[in-house]
Amino acid sequence: MDVEKTKVAFFIERKSRRGIHGAKLPREVTAVFVESGDYRMKDCYAHEGQHGVCAVDWVAEECRPATYVEYKPLMEELQNLVGYNLEVVDGEWWLTTAMGMVCKVDDYRSGKAA
């Protein structure tokens, strides 16, 4: 297990997806490693696909913060199988902060910042 804590927020898709034959798939829970990557892209982990990268915009538009019951199986997988020492942060708070950063950087780059 990691010695250092890894900050993570858990999100779940707002809508179910359809499989290749039209079957309704369960909504995927994604762990977002909030201190990784840059202001737009974050490392993430899901049962399906495991480690990857996700856009902050995707999290904001397609997901909502997961409840403990929803994210507990993924959290246990990350801790017990992968070996993370997790510190769970509030997803709604993190997303509000992250989207604020995206807007500030975009405004600065476009010359709209004061």
Can you name each region flagged by the protein language model?
Residues 1, 42, 105-106:
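Intrinsic-disorder/low-complexity regions
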Residues 20-72:
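Acidic, low-complexity, intrinsically disordered interaction modules
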Residues 59-114:
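Mixed-charge, Lys/Arg-enriched low-complexity segments
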Residues 1-3, 114:
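Basic/polar N-terminal segments that are highly enriched at the extreme N-terminus
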